[in-house]
Amino acid sequence: MKIVIDLMGADHGVLPVIEGVSRALENKSFSTVLVGDKDKATPFISKELASKVEMIHTQDYIKMEEAATEAIKRKESSIYLGMDILKNGADALISAGHSGATMGLATLRLGRIKGVERPAICTLMPSVGKRPSVLLDAGANTDCKPEYLIDFALMGYEYAKSVLHYDSPKVGLLSNGEEDIKGNMLVKETHKMLKAYDFFYGNVEGSDIFKGVVDVVVCDGFMGNVVLKTTEGVASAIGSIFKDEIKSSFKSKMGALMLKNAFDILKQKTDYAEYGGAPLLGVNKSVIISHGKSNARAIECAIYQAISAVESQVCLRITQAFESLKPSVSQSDQQDA
């Protein structure tokens, strides 16, 4: 298995990315291609790691403040070169750089799975149960039609089943109330269409995401990104409040010591790094979009995520799901025959 790693564009430079690759190679067997500035990367690559990786040198990358469309023109940028390597035989790509550039190039260079109108960003959300919830779209498509959300539901269902090994996953539609009549026009129209699928649970509220009421939560990319960023902010704020209160008195410090195991579990379940990155579902190869602020642990987990996606053949599974569950795709196949 060959995994392409975009070294460029992450908030903290190349070091966390290289450290994440090194840690993953200690636990998993895979080949990797690092794409980026060799001069910046070499000081952090040990002789042992150098013997395990291939390095493709380029100094160009798409900066966060640049338009995503720049990636199409910049054929020597790290993400363009990486996407070409993926297209021509590699199995997966991971990037903590410009997410818009990654999404755009993945769609253009790899192509969409047949029947998919819009690829979606899929992210894992912590829940009170033993397994996280899947949320999509988390930001790829701010303006959506009901048909797009149907695609998201099918892809999320298949990802939960194939990659996460959830048995008979249930899909919920994010709304401002669980009743069928709640929601804006997009939600109401999507709800009518989703009723045709056995996996559809119904409408869910924002709080249900973290209760584990359903396995997959579907929404447009605008709402999904707001949910994601709000969750990150709340988790960070709660962590800061805990730290301040623990430091406030000797009694609090002793109590925290007694609850250390519980706090460790809470931290692990709410730490974005433990979830790796966000798969871009709907394109013809596995692409993982990592957070710009990813540390070494986040990159390491993103690699494990990519390996699971490739081993489970999720792209093929989504293709098959669309052929069997989406009427327009199966009808098209019959006409072609």
From Swiss-Prot:
Top EC category: transferase
One Gene Ontology biological process: phospholipid biosynthetic process
Major location category of this protein: cytoplasm
Cellular component annotations (GO), alphabetically ordered: cytoplasm
Record-listed E.C. numbers: 2.3.1.274
Gene3D superfamilies: Isopropylmalate Dehydrogenase
Pathways involved: Lipid metabolism; phospholipid metabolism
A GO molecular-function annotation: phosphate:acyl-[acyl carrier protein] acyltransferase activity
Reactions catalysed according to its record: a fatty acyl-[ACP] + phosphate = an acyl phosphate + holo-[ACP]
Localization of this protein: Cytoplasm
Keywords: Cytoplasm, Lipid biosynthesis, Lipid metabolism, Phospholipid biosynthesis, Phospholipid metabolism, Transferase
Disulphide bridges, residue numbers: none
Superkingdom, natural source: Bacteria
Quaternary structure and interacting proteins, as annotated: Homodimer. Probably interacts with PlsY.
Record-linked HAMAP family: PlsX (MF_00019)
Role this protein plays: Catalyzes the reversible formation of acyl-phosphate (acyl-PO(4)) from acyl-[acyl-carrier-protein] (acyl-ACP). This enzyme utilizes acyl-ACP as fatty acyl donor, but not acyl-CoA.
Family: Belongs to the PlsX family.
PANTHER family: FATTY ACID/PHOSPHOLIPID SYNTHESIS PROTEIN PLSX, PHOSPHATE ACYLTRANSFERASE
UniProt-recorded name of the protein: Phosphate acyltransferase
